[in-house]
Amino acid sequence: MFVVHSMRLFTGASFRRNLMTSRRLSRKSCLSDSSTLEYSFSLYNKYCVTKKLKIKTICSFIYYYLTITISTIKNSTMSAKHLRPNITHIPVKRSYANILYFGRSAQLLETDRNAGWTKAHETACNGNLEDYEEEYKEMDKHEIDVRDGFGQTPMWIATTRCNYRNYVFLKKHGSDLHQKDYQGRSLLHATANAVNSECLDIFKDLIANGVDLYQKDMVGSTAIDELKHENSIINYETEGTLLVTNFFIFLYKFTYKFIKKLLTICYCIFSIHFFSL
C-alpha cells in the first residue's frame, strides 16, 4: 500500500503537498526520520529532473524554430540582393506580348492586334490622358474600357506602362479595375511583371481596391506566381529601397510551415507533460 501511494506522489499539484504526504505515510508505516528525509530528497531530485527535462525540451524546439526562421530570412534577402540592378528602369520582355506592352516605339503597335486600337490606347501608352478631360466626361463606361485585338483596354496599357497618372485618371472616370484581357490576365498580372516604382504604387492600389491577388489566368498562373519570376518588381530596387519587401513574400511562402511547426511543438509539449504525470 505504501508503494502504491508513493507512485501517486508524482501526480500532485506541487512538491510541497507531495512532501507532506510522504511524511504522513512514513509515520503510518513506522519509517525512521532518516528514511523520510532520504525519500524526500529522492523525490525532490526526480521532480527537478522532470522539470528540467521539460524546460530543456521546450528551449530546444524554440531554438530550432528560430534558427530555421533566421536562416530563411537571410537566404531570401541575399537572393534578392544578387538580383538588384544598378539602373532604375529595365524593360521586361518575357514574351512577344510583353514586347508589345513595353514597345520602344508606336511602330511595334501597328499589327493585327489593333483592330480595336484607339487614340485612347496610344495616349495611355505614350501620352497624358489628362489632356482629354472634356472628352472623357462625355464618354460611357464601355467607351472608356474599349478593347483592342488582345482584349486590352487603355487602363491595361497604362498599367503595363507604369503610368500612374493615366491610371488614376482612368480610375477616376470609372474604368473597371477587375477587368481581364482575352487570356484571363488581370491588371495585377500585368503590374507584377513591371520594374518601375510607379508600378508598385499601382500594384498596392489595386490590392487596396479589392482586386484578387490569387485570381488565375487561362494557364492557371496568379499574380503571386508572376512575382516569383526574375523579371518582376519583387527582385528590383529603386533608389536603394526594395520595391516589395522580402517579409511580405516570406509570410506568404512560409505561413503553412509556421503553423505546422507550431502545432508540432504544442503536441510535443503536451506529450512530455502528459507522460511525466
From Swiss-Prot:
Keywords: ANK repeat, Repeat
InterPro entries, per database record: Ank_Repeat/CDKN_Inhibitor, Ankyrin_rpt-contain_sf
ANK repeat copies, ranges: 150-179, 183-215
Gene3D superfamilies with a match to the protein in the record: Ankyrin repeat-containing domain (1.25.40.20)
Database matches in PANTHER family: ANK_REP_REGION DOMAIN-CONTAINING PROTEIN
UniProt-recorded name of the protein: Putative ankyrin repeat protein L81
Originating species: Acanthamoeba polyphaga mimivirus (APMV)
